[in-house]
């Protein structure tokens, strides 16, 4: 009898310029996608394509994160394998900054056979002529049960490295606008990427006893902090689809967020917890309202919690994995 033939798994090279030491959303996406894809495909992560590994040249599909930073890999793949799928995942800086003016990022958009945005508003940021090859895949995380939270005060948490795109100054200004007797405590988690940011965080902490800068924390305690907080604050001015938002939603923690495309695409156009980008006074007012109505079933905090619950289904791991594998399977089909 002839031996049964074994169809080898499709090989995927997942390129991400951000590797583990970056500890940011792009690395978390790459790591999670590699794990999800590996159930169906042979998948590995690399900072570039091609790299020094001999198996690199045999990949069937390239999945690249970041149009500008992965541009050399995108161009090399398109030149070496013009008929093979090239999936480009667009980050916030891609959508709302780089593709507007950066030639490398624009070329990556043209070379990709498939584009991925991480929330529904991302489609509108793409050139209209390219939207036909774009797909929305919401990121996911492991759901956590809501924690029992005190009613004696309101604890807010903000998570993100201290850099310009995250607008940490909005949180610092909001902390300055709050009074110590407002019953609102703020935890700020994230590494300072320059000495000026570290100094500002330390200065705010010294002036505002209700504000703490906890610096960078590992993933597990960061998620616990989100889970235990009454509300997550997200002040970014540019965002492609923030990990921390869906992690908060999946932990039973509602969100106060800047009204930018990336956040609206995650939380919905009618979400009641937005403040205008850069407006610390609005953020402080929302925090006060959350605190003042904390024990009311029809208060702002309760409304935010309900609104987040209605979005939670978008961020389930099973949905993300199914959408991702369906995209790769579709990309492999002959045109």
Language model features with spans:
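A short, active-site helix/loop in glycosyltransferases that binds the activated sugar's phosphate group
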Residues: 110-134, 138-144
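Conserved acidic donor-binding segment of nucleotide-sugar-dependent glycosyltransferases
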Residues: 269-281, 289-295
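Conserved donor-binding/catalytic core segment of Leloir-type glycosyltransferases
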Residues: 148-166, 172-176, 186-189
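Short hydrophobic beta-strand element within catalytic cores of glycosyltransferases
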Residues: 254-257
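Nucleotide-activated donor-binding/catalytic signature segment of Leloir-type glycosyltransferases, i.e.
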Residues: 199-217
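Glycosyltransferase donor-sugar binding loop
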Residues: 185-199, 215
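Aromatic "clamp/platform" in nucleotide-sugar-dependent glycosyltransferases that forms part
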Residues: 237
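A charged, aromatic-enriched C-terminal amphipathic alpha-helix characteristic of glycosyltransferases
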Residues: 25-28, 298-330
